[in-house]
């Protein structure tokens, strides 16, 4: 196996070669980071069916369902029920208590059961500005990773809520 820096360097080199020769390349991998780095389009399969075919940024930022959201990248998830949909937002009453305002990705109606996904890099500890979702949690663990720290919180009944905080 290649070390991390060499592996990333080789991924960029292979991507540039693909772009320069101008041919279609099908690359099969289970490494989501590698797929996001090297691809212009990605297909996510589940049980032999394509769940989403998109550009890397659209796949990561706008997954069409919870399977894709949980498959690509890291997520904190909360189960709940939609209590309101309006103005391009939905309110979800969480099964563990509390409420989250979110984008209605694949929900259609009030009363519908759903999952809310939040990427670790999207949450902020002690935000200064007013935000739709502001909740108290308890820091359980901080792990230093060089360019960021992983912070594990107990938040809204989720004891494994992860934040990525830049150093």
Where do the model's predicted regions map?
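Short, conserved clusters of charged catalytic residues that mark active-site
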Residues: 9, 63, 77, 134-135
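ABC ATPase nucleotide-binding domains
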Residues: 1-67
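ABC transporter nucleotide-binding domain
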Residues: 55-89
